[in-house]
From Swiss-Prot:
CDD domains found in the cross-reference section: NR_DBD_COUP_TF, NR_LBD_COUP-TF
Keyword Membrane among UniProt keywords: no
Protein known as: Nuclear receptor subfamily 2 group F member 6
Keywords, comma-separated and alphabetical: DNA-binding, Metal-binding, Nucleus, Phosphoprotein, Receptor, Repressor, Transcription, Transcription regulation, Zinc, Zinc-finger
Region span, Important for dimerization: 327-404
Start-end of DNA-binding region: 53-128
Source organism per UniProt: Homo sapiens
Species lineage: Eukaryota, Metazoa, Chordata, Craniata, Vertebrata
């Protein structure tokens, strides 16, 4: 049996949202009585050949044709269509591995929808949201427009391209962004494009980026509803990855010399071996920022990547790691569908984006603290500041101020 609520379902397996309404489970709807003569969603040319018995790949009942990419019965076709069109999410009452066959298909809607996605039913093929084979040109970097300008309408609730609304999750992530306005301000603060920032500018912009990181998280979808202890745990674990993503998104003009000066290395020389290791880490940081820049990641993709990094179920002390994992999966599904729709000529793009996340973890949080915040906070742990920023909200005062 499964609870049901409005939300984002997704094709990544266990991607159905957790019921936040806390309501009682609805009686499972029996789709076996779906009228065979109902409006057909079968794909042209995919009907069964006469005399050929094909079973539904979801429940094993006799299929009525190919629906949304695979052969299914009328019941599973109708269930999938209803789930997608109504934007339903389900919750499994068992272990998310319920048996789905002709006799048990109505007992757990969560596992039934999960199996629909697993066998290849395509969410985008549901007629209301069918994605055309050719789409307008990609936004932001691909179109040559200024970063974020093509997404301004989305951030205010508009569509990214005619007839193809961006998912509500991405729209909310964009509304939570302190960019693109902040990105322009950071760039302007450093003078002409490509100019080398001084030590004070590096520290000031780093403070703004960290403050913006926490502000983004505070307004990100689902995050405010989590227990405060969970919010702190998630940010303490992911802040360094979010910082690197924000540095790349803001196109922060970083160069080695001011970074080393900001870290205080000129004033306190270190042993040769340690200096070499430190320089390797500095180069690793700059390399990650550069790679994100070369990928020309747009604002929607940055929002999804940051949500995936933020909702890490491995954080210590979480009250419900499975729920956090489901939120991470929602962001991953949103990124999958967005990239598939927006960049159809780049089939490897999603994989390349996702591979950036484990690479970001190779940049130690201690390195970022020493590079950017040593002059600002001394030996105070950044994690302590993040907790204070999260709990204080916009009333938190940096030495440099977040609004300068």
């Amino acid at each position: 049996m499964a609870m049901v609520t409005g939300g984002w379902g997704g094709p990544g397996g266990d991607t159905n949202g957790v019921d936040k309404a806390g309501g009682y489970p609805r009686a499972a709807e029996d789709d076996s009585a779906s009228p065979p003569g109902a409006a057909s969603d079968a794909e042209p040319g995919d009907e069964e050949r006469p005399g050929l018995q094909v079973d539904c790949v979801v429940c094993g009942d006799k299929s009525s044709g190919k629906h949304y990419g695979v052969f299914t019965c009328e019941g599973c076709k109708s269930f999938f269509k209803r789930s997608i069109r109504r934007n339903l999410s389900y919750t499994c009452r068992s272990n998310r591995d319920c048996q789905i066959d002709q006799h048990h298909r109505n007992q757990c809607q969560y596992c039934r929808l999960k199996k629909c996605f697993r066998v290849g039913m395509r969410k985008e093929a549901v007629q209301r949201g069918r994605i055309p084979h050719s789409l307008p040109g990609a936004v932001a970097a691909s179109s040559g427009s200024p970063p974020g300008s093509a997404l301004a309408a989305v951030a205010s609730g508009g569509d990214l391209f005619p007839g193809q609304p961006v998912s509500e999750l991405i729209a909310q992530l964009l509304r939570a962004e302190p960019y693109p306005a902040a990105a322009g301000r950071f760039g302007a603060g450093g003078g002409a494009a490509g100019a080398v920032l001084g030590i004070d500018n590096v520290c000031e912009l780093a403070a703004r980026l960290l403050f913006s990181t926490v502000e983004w998280a505070r307004h990100a979808p689902f995050f405010p509803e989590l227990p405060v202890a969970d919010q702190v745990a998630l940010l303490r674990l992911s802040w360094s990855e979010l910082f690197v993503l924000n540095a790349a998104q803001a196109a922060l003009p970083l160069h080695t010399a001011p970074l080393l000066a900001a870290a205080g290395l000129h004033a306190a020389p270190m042993a040769a071996e340690r200096a070499v290791a430190f320089m390797d880490q500095v180069r690793a940081f700059q390399e990650q920022v550069d790679k994100l820049g070369r990928l020309q990641v747009d604002s929607a993709e940055y929002g999804c990547l940051k949500a995936i990094a933020l909702f890490t179920p491995d954080a210590c002390g979480l009250s419900d790691p499975a729920h956090v994992e489901s939120l991470q999966e929602k962001a991953q599904v949103a990124l999958t569908e967005y990239v598939r729709a927006q960049y159809p000529s780049q089939p490897q793009r999603f994989g390349r984006l996702l591979l950036r996340l484990p690479a970001l973890r190779a940049v130690p949080a201690s390195l970022i603290s020493q590079l950017f915040f040593m002059r600002l906070v001394g030996k105070t742990p950044i994690e302590t500041l993040i907790r204070d920023m999260l709990l204080s909200g916009s009333t938190f005062n940096w030495p440099y101020g977040s609004g300068q």
